[in-house]
């Protein structure tokens, strides 16, 4: 594997673990304000992000590459109203999408077709992640200002269950 590609994939592991930390911090915020459905949604999201990190880890391992773990930064975001984590999540998912796209461009440049194929799943996944984040913002804008609407949205989010990723390495 190209050394730069290996480096970028290692960096992505850290970014995915950071995503999990960020979403656990959001879950913690929502638990503190009594929105257990939002808490559940972000706990499930954190598990998905840990899975993404482990998929990159496993891919590097399967290809005989060294895995280097770096420190995971403390999540930083402005606490404010209940919308703040939702907006930060969309912003963050857009950064992750840009990161994966940059890896894909580097992989394409060196014609690493196996890694391109693996990254195809992540590119599709990021489209779903951005849509989910944007949809939550839309729902909160529509219903979050009304206590009954917020209750219903919270109940909907409480029903989310963890599903393991479909990517098999």
Task: Please provide the spans of the model-predicted regions.
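Iron-associated oxidoreductase/ferritin-like identity signal
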Residues: 1-169
């Amino acid at each position: 594997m190209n050394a730069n590609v290996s480096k970028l994939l290692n960096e992505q592991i850290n970014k995915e673990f950071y995503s999990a930390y960020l979403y656990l911090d959001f879950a913690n915020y929502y638990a503190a304000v009594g929105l257990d459905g939002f808490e559940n949604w972000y706990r499930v999201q954190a598990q998905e992000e840990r899975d993404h990190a482990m998929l990159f880890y496993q891919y590097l391992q399967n290809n005989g590459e060294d895995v280097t773990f770096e420190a995971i930064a403390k999540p930083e975001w402005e606490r404010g109203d209940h919308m703040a984590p939702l907006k930060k999540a969309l912003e963050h998912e857009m950064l992750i999408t840009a990161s994966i796209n940059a890896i894909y461009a580097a992989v394409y440049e060196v014609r690493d077709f196996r890694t391109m194929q693996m990254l195809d799943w992540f590119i599709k996944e990021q489209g779903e992640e951005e849509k989910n984040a944007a949809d939550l913002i839309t729902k909160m804008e529509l219903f979050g200002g009304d206590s009954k609407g917020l209750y219903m949205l919270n109940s909907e989010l409480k029903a989310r269950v963890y599903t393991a990723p479909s990517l098999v390495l």
